């Protein structure tokens, strides 16, 4: 008596479909599925070893060869 039967759940599902509409429920399902997929991909990226992450860094040579386009003021007023 305390538990809900399959008929109770079908009636609740029918009422929810009537209130929100099937198009909105389909959009919610699609958004939820995309969020779960993104979460799983994020967890896989977090599991990569630290050695692989370090290989993606750019090498640092120490010297950079560039030409300045304009001279910066030395008055301390950097607006």
Curated annotation (Swiss-Prot):
Membrane topology qualifier: Single-pass membrane protein
Tell me, which GO biological process terms does this entry list?
protein transport by the Tat complex
Keywords of this protein's UniProt record, alphabetized?
Cell inner membrane, Cell membrane, Membrane, Protein transport, Translocation, Transmembrane, Transmembrane helix, Transport
Segment forming the signal sequence = none
* Keyword field contains Plastid: no
Q: List the disulfide bonds.
A: none
Which Gene3D superfamilies does the entry mention?
Answer: 1.20.5.3310
Compartments where found: Cell inner membrane
How this chain assembles, per its entry, is: The Tat system comprises two distinct complexes: a TatABC complex, containing multiple copies of TatA, TatB and TatC subunits, and a separate TatA complex, containing only TatA subunits. Substrates initially bind to the TatABC complex, which probably triggers association of the separate TatA complex to form the active translocon.
Q: What does this protein do?
A: Part of the twin-arginine translocation (Tat) system that transports large folded proteins containing a characteristic twin-arginine motif in their signal peptide across membranes. TatA could form the protein-conducting channel of the Tat system.
Describe the family membership recorded for this protein in Swiss-Prot or TrEMBL.
Belongs to the TatA/E family.
**PANTHER family according to UniProt:** SEC-INDEPENDENT PROTEIN TRANSLOCASE PROTEIN TATA
Give the HAMAP family listed for this entry.
Answer: TatA_E
Report the NCBIfam families cross-referenced here.
PRK02958.1, tatAE
Question: How is this protein named in the record?
Answer: Sec-independent protein translocase protein TatA
Q: Which organism is it from?
A: Paraburkholderia xenovorans (strain LB400)
Upper classification of the organism: Bacteria, Pseudomonadati, Pseudomonadota, Betaproteobacteria, Burkholderiales
The record's gene field reads tatA
């Amino acid at each position: 008596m305390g538990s809900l039967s399959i008929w109770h759940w079908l009636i609740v599902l029918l009422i929810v479909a009537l209130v929100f509409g099937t198009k909105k429920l389909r959009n919610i399902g699609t958004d939820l599925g995309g969020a779960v997929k993104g979460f799983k991909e994020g967890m896989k990226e977090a599991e990569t070893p630290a050695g692989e992450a370090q290989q993606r860094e750019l090498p640092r040579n120490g010297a950079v060869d560039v030409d300045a386009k304009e001279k910066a003021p030395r008055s301390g007023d950097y607006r």
